[in-house]
């Protein structure tokens, strides 16, 4: 219920023979795999967009013979955002108050190390495929907007050196500095591709000495903008959050 919008042509539209379609049924909700299945396997819908579904599952759905997949490298980027504010501490009735400093992510060395711990090529090849290239630019897909001054690399040794030099010492399996453990939360929406991305990144981060708590939130909640919803991307009450934009 309440997950579909139906548009019907206006017979009095100002231009003759337009719009082309007499009726358009736009359906939301559900998950990416179900959307792909509705087009590729059952044929219930004509088009589905932003199918963040594993390549092997899409290949299987294609056997249904109802549709095809068109992949175009666009401007959307799956990214991990870092919370600079102290979201755990309440100041003047507000968590993550502007000007407060996240005791872990607020350290530039930590951010640099986390960046070096992301295997973009593995994530791209294994989980996305179809020519979805890894990138270091948040503005991507438009040559004129792509900075030539940024690059990415996966280098845990270099990341470890940066943390060592910044005073994040390894005590057992977890680093700490000034009495603060390198314990972080990492949230995204419930989606098989994103959960596998989380697992890949967590493994690398933990090798560096971070303690990582993975969190998953239903997409309808994660992307909901309600003021009272503390699990959405707008509140960002986590150290890391991941989604596409």
Task: For the regions a language model picked out, list residue spans one by one.
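Short, glycine/acidic-rich hinge or "gate" loops at secondary-structure transitions
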Residues: 130-136, 215
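Extracytoplasmic/periplasmic ligand-capture domains
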Residues: 1-127, 143-245
């Amino acid at each position: 219920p309440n997950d579909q919008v139906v548009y019907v042509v206006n017979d009095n539209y100002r231009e003759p023979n337009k719009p082309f379609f007499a009726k358009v049924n736009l359906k939301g909700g559900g998950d990416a795999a179900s959307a792909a299945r509705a087009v590729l396997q059952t044929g219930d819908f004509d088009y589905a967009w932003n199918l963040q579904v594993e390549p092997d599952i899409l290949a299987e759905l294609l056997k249904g013979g109802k549709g095809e997949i068109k992949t175009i490298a666009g401007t959307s980027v799956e990214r991990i955002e870092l919370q600079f504010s102290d979201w755990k501490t309440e100041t003047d009735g507000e968590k993550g108050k502007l000007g407060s400093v996240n005791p872990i992510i607020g350290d530039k060395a930590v951010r640099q190390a986390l960046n070096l711990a992301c295997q973009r090529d593995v994530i791209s090849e294994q989980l996305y495929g179809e020519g979805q290239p890894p990138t270091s630019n948040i503005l991507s897909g438009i040559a004129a907007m792509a900075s030539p001054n940024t690059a990415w690399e996966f280098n845990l040794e270099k990341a470890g050196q940066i943390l060592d030099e910044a005073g994040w010492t390894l005590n057992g399996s977890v680093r700490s500095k000034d009495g603060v453990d390198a314990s972080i939360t990492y949230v995204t929406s419930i989606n098989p591709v994103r959960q596998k991305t989380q697992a890949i990144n967590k493994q690398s981060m933990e090798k560096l000495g971070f303690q990582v708590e993975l969190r998953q939130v239903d997409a309808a909640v994660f992307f909901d903008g309600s003021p009272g919803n503390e699990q959405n991307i707008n509140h960002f009450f986590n150290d890391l959050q991941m989604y596409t934009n």
